[in-house]
Amino acid sequence: MIPRIRQSQRDLIDVSNITDANSLLIYNTDEDCYNYYSKTEQEWQSLCGKLGKADFTIEDCSRIRVNGVYQNNVALTSANYLTIPVNVTKVGSYSIQVVPNPANGYYFSTSGEFLSTGTFEITVPGSGTPVNYTPTGSDGDEIKITLNGIDLDCSNKPKIKIEDTTKRPRFAISCNSVTVHGVYKKGIATTTANKITMRLNVYDGSQGATYSVKTDMIDGLSFSGSGVLGAAGTQEIVLYAEGTPYSTSSKLFTITTNSESTTATCQALVVPVISKKKIMAAGSTTYGLTSGGENGCDAMIKNIMNYGDNENSIIKYEGFASVETSSSLSDLATWVGGTQPYDIIVITYNLTPNDAQRALLVDYVNKGGVLIYLDQNNSGTDGTRNVQLVGEIFGESIDRPVDIASTCNYVIKMNPGVDDEISNGPFGDVRNGQWGEDYNNSCGLPVVPRGAIVYAGAINASTGLASTSGAQATILRHPTKNFFWCGDSGLIHGGTSTSNTTTPFQIGSRTFNGVTYPKYPVDKQAYGNQAAANRLPVCNSTLFANVMAWAIKMAEESGINSGK
């Protein structure tokens, strides 16, 4: 008689003498299969296959997903399947069967081999035709799960609702009611807080029918919801998120339904939170990225309603709480080098890079680094170096800075012909506005580099006339590299001053759709050195808020550390 033993008992058999052990035969009760010892392989082999049966389980049955619509007297198709997460601790063959309990004319089944251990999601296709629909008040068919012939005992198993085919789902979807809720982070599993709410318009005669509404899957994330249609009229429903986002890119989902009266779809945009970036703010703290205290740029960028992981944050980002500062460029080689260089470098007053530093910055930008360069030096060696950096990033030679002086009355017209995420971005549209010079010593470029996106030339916004200085550009960026330049080191100089010729950066409280943003960028009013009646609002803070949103996005998607 062939001995029937467990695998642990089999492994205690002395097989050190492979000649004597060769061809030993046992029945492995764990695998439910015959095993024999092979002298050639010097290991136990299974007659059920070289790998034998796998050891695996479902650790959380609540994560089993039921896909598709199920109707009585309607055969299952390829759209009807289960997605089951399993944890494999031993490679080998597997079989999975899922049946309704009690039986109802359909089932799910699959088999195969696990070639490595770890966690996997298995798709288990359905077959058959449901016989009985789910009665009113019931959650659906209970299921029994069998893994390699052994019934699995687990709680929180999903139930499968079978629609009554005599009740037809006829309804329309209201796209303007679609609202995305929750915070989405790369690598973090979604919870019940992650959902989409929307309204249905239920038609007469559909009460009691089952609705099914879902999205496509993008980057590991999808939404779905189902339920029973109520009386004719408006009905709010919830689509809960499933899965874990595996990228920070924005995701535009298409919402589809099982309505028999329309094939219309809606869309829902999900914007995941971008991870924190290494940021260096170089220059005077009076004029730089962290200037202005509670009334300036520092407060604007660090407020989580502007840039944060709040559900209502304008930019979904882990925040600027850890911005580093430096009053010199002496450590620039360290900032741009190594295995983890700074993602974003912001240079303001009064730090014009020397020749060696310029070469480092050009290389940094060419490798994907984000450089925001605000420099008003317009004469002498530093003036030349200022515009040389711009030229070299564009692959051109520019060595003559232009002094704007007071030729624009401190208010320079924005370019209305440029429409992108900086000129018309998440914090507002500045295309028909003007930016304010901080004092009257801005630098302009004598030429526009090839391909440059010019946000502002040198047109006096109060008169509509071009500056007599001959400047052609005062604010621009590169079309493909992560580089932004402004010829005024005080572009983001802010605070509580009411001066009409300095501190053009201002923030205030704004409320949108019932949500308050206490440190929001706002125009500074009545700016410029012209007659009081002709002074204008300036958009410095809105412009720069959009610039920082662009910088974060570029650092994430095409930055120097992207993909690391």
Label every PLM stretch briefly.
Residues P100-L115, T215-L229, S261-T263:
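Short, solvent-exposed loop/linker segments at beta-strand-coil boundaries, enriched for Pro/Gly
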Residues P272-I344:
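Aromatic-Pro/Gly-enriched surface loop or interdomain linker
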Residues S127-P135, E242-T248:
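Short, surface-exposed loop/turn segments at beta-strand-coil junctions that are enriched for proline
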Residues M1-Y27:
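Extracellular/surface-exposed low-complexity repeats and stalk/linker segments enriched in Gly/Pro
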Residues A405-R510:
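Catalytic beta-strand/loop cores that center a nucleophilic Ser/Cys/Thr
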Residues L351-Y439:
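A glycine-rich, often tryptophan-bearing local segment used as a flexible ligand/cofactor-contacting loop or short
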Residues K481-F484, D488-K564:
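Extracellular ligand-binding/catalytic regions of CAZymes and related secreted enzymes
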Residues L25-K50, L371-Y373:
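Short, surface-exposed terminal/edge motifs of secreted or surface/virion proteins that either
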